Amino acid sequence: MNPPTVTVHDSTLRDGQHAVRHQLDADQIRAYAVAADTAGVPVLEVGHGNGIGASSRQVGLSKTDDATMLTTAREAMPHSRLATLMLPGWATSTDLRSAIRHGVDIVRVAAHCTEADVTERHLGVIRDLGAEAQGVLLMSHLAAPDELAAQCQRMVGYGAQAVCIFDSAGTYLPEDVTARITAITTAVDVPVAFHGHNNLGMAVANSLAAVRAGARVLDACARGFGAGAGNTQLEVLVAVLERYGHPTGIDLRLVAQAADLAERTLMPAPPTIDSTSLVSGLAGVFSGFKKPVLAAAQRAGVSPWDVFVELGRRRVLAGQEDLIPDAINTLTSMGERP
């Protein structure tokens, strides 16, 4: 039996934005989109790190507006499909209509792992507008496999044509992925995707576990570009999939060159697993908290490690960075210091 084909979903120009405070410009987007398209990357996701409509003081003002980002990428890619992400509460139906008008083929609607209900209206709008609608569950480690499967069933019922779970905190080991993807693929009859982060150095291994459990779409970023320890590394994932015989349609040499370009032009340095990224994975806290935690901990004279442990105890979610000062207050009241 031949290994199944795997669709690689390149999130470099969306999830990578977290690493540069959403400051990618049109020239950077254009150059990478051309390289990805040339390499045969089937899907390229573009946007503010938190999705369309999310540019704000709370989660970061984008250097480039949504319309410019999407139009620039669309014009640079005659072959690859263009995807974007939206979070209900940030993006509106108006944002969706604008994104699809600017050439988006796939819209992912993301929600906390136990709150699939909030995706219903948006998934329906996307289908009505003629784009492919996908449902995403964030912070998926906070839900048991059967709960994730039930939430994915709801999204499929709302119109999702694929479902994806994010290891938002980079906390999974392969057996965690196997249990969750197996439960989901058993419960739904649409493609299942996995989005890994590399806090524990397991992103590629976890992605392989996902495929073996039935996932057919894997997310990745060039050089792992992303917050903290970064995402599944695109060019490494393609190479490993190739070694295992999984067709991807991607030219390995050209995607490696695209990753070289990304390192030179998109990021100050490739992501690494430092102690802060490690503890955020262990604590189950989204990697986007890294920079604000480091800054706040330094000002307060407390250990970033302890801040992450406290945030993990509180089960914080992306967008709740305003809880960092309160976590630090708790630590200082307990007499915690570096």
From Swiss-Prot:
Pfam families: DmpG_comm, HMGL-like. Its EC number is 4.1.3.39. Keywords: Aromatic hydrocarbons catabolism, Lyase, Manganese, Metal-binding, Plasmid. InterPro entries: 2-IPM_HCS-like, 4OH_2_O-val_aldolase, Aldolase_TIM, DmpG_comm, DRE_TIM_HOA, PYR_CT. The record marks 14 as: Transition state stabilizer. Mn(2+) binds at residues 15, 195, 197. Residues 6-256 form the Pyruvate carboxyltransferase domain. The active site is at 18 (proton acceptor). GO terms for molecular function: 2-isopropylmalate synthase activity; 4-hydroxy-2-oxovalerate aldolase activity; manganese ion binding. CDD domains: DRE_TIM_HOA. It catalyses: (S)-4-hydroxy-2-oxopentanoate = acetaldehyde + pyruvate. GO terms for biological process: catabolic process; L-leucine biosynthetic process. HAMAP family: HOA. Belongs to the 4-hydroxy-2-oxovalerate aldolase family. This is 4-hydroxy-2-oxovalerate aldolase.
